[in-house]
């Protein structure tokens, strides 16, 4: 899916997860000018052809997916910075971006991006995920950018402590204080429900969502 605007952009942002790739062309105020949604998650990448046959080069697969997502944007505006978040920075991704330990000040994330150099082409910078080592070990990749957005919107609102709910297959509840992530928990409710619905006798009694 794509939508478009000829307005001048300031940034390309990628939300690159396990099952899909979302690309956003943003202006200087953070407004969305263009969006694209492709089925190329890190576990399902396009395969380059070599002598008419598909090859198994993972790096080439990432390059192909990246080109489909925003190659024309960069040809039109080659100086645009590109920032990516999500599982693209995992050990199975394009390049691993080290986790930052919680508690952490969110502005610090922007100073520790992992750079992917692309043979003279526009580099890609990957946002680090967060890891919580105390208590039950916990990690996140991609959700930290959503937390950043919530806290940015809350700036000046007078609330010191914020509890943020992030629904999904692996839902998260994040506690933040004055721009600092102090704790988060992950719940596998969505995945457990999907497993029950698809692989147990209980699933036969579950109706479709309205």
Language model regions located:
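Short glycine-rich, Thr/Ser-proximal phosphate-binding strand/loop in the N-terminal lobe
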Residues: 11-60
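Gly/Ser/Thr-rich loops at beta-strand to alpha-helix junctions
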Residues: 17-22, 38, 87-91, 166-172
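Conserved active-site "lid/cap" helical segment
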Residues: 52-77
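Solvent-exposed alpha-helices and their adjacent loops that cap or buttress functional pockets
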Residues: 2-6, 75, 117-119, 153-158, ...
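Short beta-strand-loop/turn "lid" adjacent to the catalytic site in phosphate-handling enzymes
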Residues: 71-137
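Glycine-rich phosphate-binding loop plus the immediately following alpha-helix
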Residues: 43-45, 131-158, 162-163, 167-210
